[in-house]
From Swiss-Prot:
This is Formamidopyrimidine-DNA glycosylase. It catalyses: Hydrolysis of DNA containing ring-opened 7-methylguanine residues, releasing 2,6-diamino-4-hydroxy-5-(N-methyl)formamidopyrimidine; 2'-deoxyribonucleotide-(2'-deoxyribose 5'-phosphate)-2'-deoxyribonucleotide-DNA = a 3'-end 2'-deoxyribonucleotide-(2,3-dehydro-2,3-deoxyribose 5'-phosphate)-DNA + a 5'-end 5'-phospho-2'-deoxyribonucleoside-DNA + H(+). The keyword Hydrolase applies. Keywords: DNA damage, DNA repair, DNA-binding, Glycosidase, Hydrolase, Lyase, Metal-binding, Multifunctional enzyme, Zinc, Zinc-finger. Its EC number is 3.2.2.23, 4.2.99.18. It comes from the Bacteria. Its cofactor is Zn(2+). DNA binds at H104, R123, R166. Binds 1 zinc ion per subunit. A zinc finger (FPG-type) spans 251-287. Monomer.
Length: 287
């Protein structure tokens, strides 16, 4: 599933085409994705102007001039194709370029400027909704979300409060969207390794002085991933078709059996299943 850097990469790819654009037509080729499309979806969007493109956690938000916000989530395999007057760019399929199958083209947006943005989703785990803009922060998807990890509201004090007296490992708590918004398995594994913290250590036993380096590692690994367009693994591609390259910088994720890259560490990267997900870590230098 695309994580925060991948979603931010898609948002940035869509922004030049959709931010400020008026939708001349909208077509929904089916009544549902993961969830049914909202009542009047096409009518409420047609003729509306998209004021800007935002991101909250793994959601792309498009506030409209009519008082609603279009909320989009990519799910597992959602992607966009942009066809502009200067040409069409098709998205890749993580590790290779593919031509999207038209049978998976579920929603098509056309702008007054002549651009067509098509949402493809073979597995239909993504979804779209229209929420009154002044109610977005109160919606069930967002009301309990923690701070954005790249924002000023996320710091060591956030983790100190979330970890206090908790027996769960830090990975489990960092994946909880109530702790911090948008973190996923890949980047939590990478940040914990950079900060030398075991994903299994009871969070309440982690010394407070270690939380500042952990916070910095989370911010650094996300910023680096956004800079290079996210990680190309299986289904993610940027809106302009570019593939992400952060996977080439992985230190532990999907590196089972390889030497730990930490200088002077003699450990070997291991993998264990934790809460149904693969956890990659160094059993020597992560304590």
């Amino acid at each position: 599933m695309p994580e925060l850097p991948e979603v931010e990469t898609v948002r940035r790819g869509l922004e030049p085409v959709l931010s400020g654009a008026r939708l001349s037509s909208v077509r929904a080729n089916r009544p549902d994705l993961r969830f049914p499309l909202p009542d009047g979806f096409v009518q409420r969007l047609t003729g509306a102007r998209i004021l800007r493109l935002d991101r909250r956690a793994k959601y792309i938000l498009a506030p409209l001039d009519r008082g609603d916000t279009l909320v989009m989530h990519l799910g597992m395999t959602g992607r966009f194709e942009i066809a502009a007057p200067e040409g069409t760019v098709r998205p890749g399929d993580f590790a290779r370029e593919v031509t999207p199958d038209d049978k998976h083209a579920h929603v098509v947006f056309q702008t007054e400027d002549g651009a067509t943005v098509t949402y493809f989703d073979p597995r239909r785990f993504g979804f779209m909704d229209l929420i009154p803009t002044d109610r977005v922060s109160h919606h069930a998807w967002f009301a309990a979300m923690g701070p954005e990890p790249l924002g000023e509201g996320f710091d060591a004090r956030t983790l100190e409060k979330a970890f206090a007296n908790r027996k769960q490992g830090p990975k489990t708590l960092l994946l909880d969207q109530r702790t911090v918004a948008g973190l996923g398995n890949i980047y939590v594994c990478e940040a914990l390794h950079r900060s030398g913290i075991s994903p299994f250590k009871p969070s309440g036993n982690i010394a407070k002085k270690r939380l500042t380096p952990l916070t910095a590692a989370i911010k650094d690994v996300l910023a680096e991933a956004v800079e290079v367009g996210g990680s190309t693994l299986k289904d993610f591609a940027a809106a302009d078709g570019a593939l992400g390259y952060f996977q080439h910088r992985f230190r532990v994720y999907d590196r089972e059996g390889e030497p730990c890259p930490t200088p002077a560490c003699k450990g070997v990267i291991a993998r264990e299943v934790q809460a149904g997900r693969s956890t990659f870590f160094c059993p020597v230098c992560q304590v």
